[in-house]
């Protein structure tokens, strides 16, 4: 908002969000597959998904998710010992702090799914990759983030009573696998007019 008003800045960020989401997913898939076409396709699906399209109607904090694939990329590189401990801890800490500032919901979801993925791979790939080192370094990063975010946690705890009881309807902002094939209300051309 230094150069433009809030509305213009918001619109620019809404235009950048899908492209940055797609690019981050492209980097992750390109690293995993070494196939540019597959990475392009996956980046497109991630960056311009119905989830992003529906949240661009008013939830920029939920539509801006490029840090999620970047956190996963950093974790995979650490598990494969392609990045040092200090670099991993510092990078993951910065990414988590940024994601906390953007959206705590996305961070909590990423942490939960990351833990499920970790335990899945721990039992299937623990001999081929450094799962214990990844867990230790992630724990150190989590402690660092907790210390740095302790003032925010304090005020979140104080404001817990002010959370409204009602939950928004999932009709508009819901996500399902059919959304890629059958357009939802938010992705259908013309929206509610048709």
Question: Where on the chain are the PLM-derived regions?
Answer:
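Membrane-embedded helix bundles of polyisoprenyl
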Residues: 15, 19-32, 37-123, 137-151
């Amino acid at each position: 908002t230094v150069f433009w008003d809030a509305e213009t800045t918001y619109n620019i960020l809404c235009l950048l969000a899908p492209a940055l989401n797609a690019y981050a997913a492209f980097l992750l898939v390109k690293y995993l597959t070494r196939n540019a076409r597959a990475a392009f396709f996956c980046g497109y699906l991630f960056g311009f998904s119905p989830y992003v399209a529906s949240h661009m109607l008013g939830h920029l904090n939920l539509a801006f998710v490029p840090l999620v694939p970047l956190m996963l990329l950093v974790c995979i590189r650490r598990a494969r010992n392609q990045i040092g401990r200090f670099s991993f801890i510092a990078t993951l800490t910065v990414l988590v702090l940024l994601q906390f500032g953007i959206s705590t919901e996305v961070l909590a979801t990423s942490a939960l799914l990351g833990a499920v993925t970790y335990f899945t791979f721990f039992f299937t790939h623990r001999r081929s990759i450094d799962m214990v080192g990844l867990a230790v370094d992630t724990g150190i990063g989590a402690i660092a983030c907790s210390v740095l975010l302790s003032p925010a946690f304090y005020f979140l705890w104080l404001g817990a009573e002010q959370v409204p009881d009602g939950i928004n309807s999932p009709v508009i902002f819901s996500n399902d696998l059919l959304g890629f094939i059958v357009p939802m209300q938010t992705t259908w051309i013309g929206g509610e007019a048709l």
